[in-house]
Amino acid sequence: MKKGIHPENYRTVLFYDSNAKQGFLIRSCARTTTTMKWEDGHEYPVFMCDTSSASHPYYTGKTRQIANEGRASDFVNRYGKFGTLKSK
């Protein structure tokens, strides 16, 4: 690396995905306040991530179904039986 072009706090940081329970060692300037012991026995500053390539559906191939149906079908499911006529 060329000297003098990187910030002073450019160091190895552990980016830890809390959903996948997996970490990545990356050189970064991210500000951190906590440290974590890594698999190699060294202690690194840790940056907690909610999503990374280990847990994102695009990279894992797993799909999440948030809403299968629209608002109209929710209405029909809730109130559809009130419009039917009952025979005596």
Curated annotation (Swiss-Prot):
**GO MF terms, alphabetically ordered:** structural constituent of ribosome
- A GO term (biological process) for this protein? translation
- Taxonomic superkingdom: Bacteria
What SUPFAM superfamilies has UniProt attached to this entry?
Answer: L28p-like
Alphabetized, the UniProt keywords read:
Ribonucleoprotein, Ribosomal protein
Ranges in a coiled coil: none
Quote a single Gene Ontology cellular component term. Answer: ribosome
Family classification: Belongs to the bacterial ribosomal protein bL31 family. Type B subfamily.
Quaternary structure and partners = Part of the 50S ribosomal subunit.
Protein name as it appears in the record: Large ribosomal subunit protein bL31B
Q: Organism, per UniProt?
A: Pasteurella multocida (strain Pm70)
- Could you tell me the gene encoding this protein? rpmE2
